[in-house]
Swiss-Prot record:
Coiled coil: none annotated. The active site is at D69, E121. It catalyses: [amino-group carrier protein]-C-terminal-gamma-(L-lysyl)-L-glutamate + H2O = [amino-group carrier protein]-C-terminal-L-glutamate + L-lysine; [amino-group carrier protein]-C-terminal-gamma-(L-ornithyl)-L-glutamate + H2O = [amino-group carrier protein]-C-terminal-L-glutamate + L-ornithine. InterPro entries: ArgE/DapE_CS, Bact_exopeptidase_dim_dom, LysK, Peptidase_M20, Peptidase_M20_dimer, Peptidase_M20A. Its EC number is 3.5.1.130, 3.5.1.132. This is [LysW]-lysine/[LysW]-ornithine hydrolase. Its cofactor is Zn(2+); Co(2+). It is an enzyme of class 3 (hydrolase). One of its GO terms (molecular function) is cobalt ion binding.
Length: 346
C-alpha cells in the first residue's frame, strides 16, 4: 500500500509539472493535444477530442470532469519540496490530474469511468455546453474544482450578464439641458446591489462607456451588469427590476446560467464525504458564490457534486500553488467514492 502511494505521488508530480508547462488559456486548449495523446496510450484509455477542444478518456456512466483552460498569464512551473507552483495549479490542473489518475486506476480495477478535460470553463463554458447538448447522460458526475481539499460543494449561484444600450440627445456642453451620463448614473445607483451575503442577489456594473467629444453630451451610453443570485432568488423579479429602471433602453441578456443546489443526502454527496472520512479527515458541505460547469451539467446527470484539491483563495492569483498531499487526498477520495457508488449499483 505504501509503495502504491509513493508511485501515485511520483506520477502526480510528473504529470502536473508537465501539464503546467503547457500554457492553455481559454481558446488555446489545443496545445494540450500531445499531452492527452501520450496519456491515452500510456493508460490504455481511448481518447476523443471534441469540436470545442475538450478531451475525453475512457467510457462509462460515471464522469470525472475538470477543465483544461486557465485564466491568462503564464507562470513558470516550479517545485519547492512537496509544493508545485504554476498557472492552473489550483484552478484547475491540480484537480484535473487527480481525476485523470483516478480514472486510470478505477478502469484498471474494472470500473467504467470517463474522464473529461473540458474547454473554456473560464470563458463561456463551451466544453460544458457542448457536452450538455450532446445527448449523453450520466448516472453520476463529479466536477473537479478546488474546494480546499476537504469541502464538498453542493451549491453555486447563478449569473446573468446584461448589455444595456441607452440613447439621448447630444447637446453642446455649455448649454445642455440633458445629459445621458447623469441619467445613467442615477439609474445605476437605483439598481445597484452590493455583494453582501450568499442569499442576497447582487447587481454590479462592470463596464460603462459613453461620449465621444469633450464638449458634447453623449447620444449613446453602454452599460454592462453582472448579476449573481442564489436558488432562493427569482430571476424574473431581478430582470423586472432592471427593465423597470431602464424602460427606454435596449437590454440584451448575453449570458444566463441558472443556480444549482443538490440534495445533500444524495448518494454521490455521501460517497464523496465518506471518501474523505475513510482517510481520517473531516469533510464539510460548502457552497460557492460564483458559477462552475456544475451549473451547466446538472441536467445531464442523475446526481452531481463538485469536489477537488487546492486552496480556492489562490485561484487566478500569481501565487497559484498546490501540494502533492492535497492532490493525493483528492485522488483517493475520487476512488473511494466511485467504488462505493459502483457497489451500490450491484
Amino acid at each position: 500500500m505504501q509503495l502504491e502511494k509513493e508511485l501515485s505521488r511520483r506520477k502526480i508530480k510528473e504529470l502536473l509539472l508537465e501539464i503546467l508547462s503547457i500554457y492553455t488559456p481559454s481558446g488555446e486548449e489545443e496545445r494540450a493535444k500531445d499531452f492527452f495523446e501520450k496519456v491515452s496510450k500510456e493508460f490504455n484509455l481511448n481518447l476523443e477530442i471534441s469540436k470545442s477542444k475538450s478531451y475525453f478518456l475512457g467510457k462509462g456512466d460515471i464522469l470525472l470532469a475538470s477543465h483544461i483552460d486557465t485564466v491568462p498569464g503564464f507562470i513558470q512551473p516550479k517545485i519547492e519540496g512537496e509544493v508545485i507552483y504554476g498557472r492552473g495549479a489550483v484552478d484547475a490542473k491540480g484537480p484535473l490530474i487527480a481525476m485523470l489518475l483516478a480514472t486510470y486506476i478505477l478502469n484498471e480495477k474494472g470500473y467504467k469511468v470517463q474522464f473529461a478535460a473540458l474547454a473554456d470553463e473560464e470563458g463561456k463554458s463551451k466544453g460544458a455546453r457542448e457536452l450538455a447538448n450532446s445527448g449523453i447522460r450520466y448516472n453520476y458526475i463529479i466536477i473537479g474544482e478546488p474546494s480546499n481539499t476537504l469541502d464538498v460543494i453542493v451549491e453555486y449561484r447563478g449569473v446573468l450578464h446584461l448589455d444595456i444600450l441607452c440613447r439621448g440627445n447630444s447637446q453642446h456642453s455649455s448649454s445642455s439641458k440633458e445629459n445621458l451620463i447623469v441619467d445613467l448614473s442615477k439609474k445605476i445607483l437605483e439598481i445597484y446591489r452590493e455583494p453582501s451575503n450568499y442569499e442576497n442577489f447582487s447587481i454590479v456594473p462592470t463596464i460603462i462607456k459613453s461620449g465621444d467629444y469633450i464638449n458634447m453630451t453623449p447620444s449613446e451610453g453602454y452599460l454592462h451588469l453582472d448579476i449573481r443570485y442564489s436558488i432562493k432568488n427569482s430571476k424574473d423579479e431581478i430582470l423586472a427590476l432592471i427593465h423597470n429602471e431602464f424602460k427606454t433602453c435596449d437590454i440584451k441578456i448575453v449570458e444566463d446560467i441558472e443556480p444549482v443546489k443538490v440534495d445533500v443526502n444524495s448518494n454521490i454527496v455521501k460517497a464523496v464525504m465518506r471518501g474523505i472520512i475513510k482517510q481520517g479527515y473531516k469533510p464539510k458541505l460548502a457552497r460557492k458564490a460564483g458559477t462552475s460547469d456544475m451549473n451547466i451539467l446538472k441536467n445531464i446527470a442523475k446526481e452531481i457534486v463538485t469536489y477537488g484539491p487546492g486552496n480556492s483563495t489562490l485561484e487566478h492569483t500569481n501565487n497559484e500553488k498546490i501540494s502533492i498531499d492535497e492532490i493525493f487526498i483528492a485522488l483517493t477520495t475520487y476512488i473511494n467514492a466511485i467504488e462505493e457508488l459502483c457497489l451500490k449499483k450491484k
